[in-house]
Amino acid sequence: MTAVQATGLALRYGRTTALEDVSFTLRTGVTGLLGPNGAGKTTLLRIVATALPADGGSLRVFGHDPSTPPGRLAVRRLLGYLPQDPGFHPSFTAFEFVDYVAILKELTHRATRHTEVARVLSAVGLDDRRRSRIRTLSGGMRQRLALAAALVGDPDLVILDEPTVGLDPEQRLRFRELIADLGERKTVLLSTHQTEDVMSLCQEVIVLDRGRVRFEGTPVELAGLAAGRVWTSAARQAGALASWRTGTGLHRHVGDPPPGAALVQPSIEDGYLTLVGVVTEASAVAGGTR
């Protein structure tokens, strides 16, 4: 079943084009939204989450048109949204924060609402921290708390804006496990700078650059864009689209290889860089685009 159908979405801020002719389809599973800073990822997520209207194009979420008041209300009842800034009130406890979100989501019956709050806190592993003040929680716990708030009401569409940013490796792994489980049952759209998130989580990936969709397909297809265009050498080579020194001391290059180059298997990051990036003399960081 098609969860989200976007056709020709556009948005301008004065003379600045934020999005132009953006089209894509979302179904059950996890879709990653990759792109450099300023590509329009957060803007696009906010449009899908009905927090921002588009200037042009059409959007349907489970058949509803969010450009109309009835459609917007219907969509909001079907989605959960984790923005980059969840709007925590530091004096709230974990339970109080999620309970507040549940009230905003129209769960008015107190006993039913508290049962739902307990359910989502348990789902993200925070059942034993429900009475903790938010200011006492670690960064990873706060991210899980924000996810719990997004899951109130068991939404069919979950939108996550860079959910793993700022997490240490262990926290990132736990968060990915939660998202992967969601993707088995829900439609999940997440923005990320981490190609490792895409490799470990996503069935589909969209690459956005300068407000336009540059790619829509599977992670394997994204990596395949760099087939025959990735090689390594002992030293930097001029003329490569992207070139960086790896942890092994070798330089990895993306572009048009010279004769006799030592070609290697392309990664998702290589495919991404083929589309949007120029990297020179940068150290490779596992799972990240540089």
Briefly describe each language-model feature range.
Residues D99, I103-E106, A111-R129:
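Conserved ABC ATPase "signature" region
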Residues M1-D21, R27, P69-G71:
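A short, flexible loop at the N-terminus of ABC-type nucleotide-binding domains that lies
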Residues L147:
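Hydrophobic anchor residue at the start of the ABC signature
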Residues V4, G57-T68, A74-V75:
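Conserved ABC transporter NBD signature motif
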Residues A49:
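Helix-to-loop junction immediately C-terminal to a conserved catalytic motif
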Residues V158-E162, L167:
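Catalytic Walker B motif of ABC-type/P-loop ATPase nucleotide-binding domains
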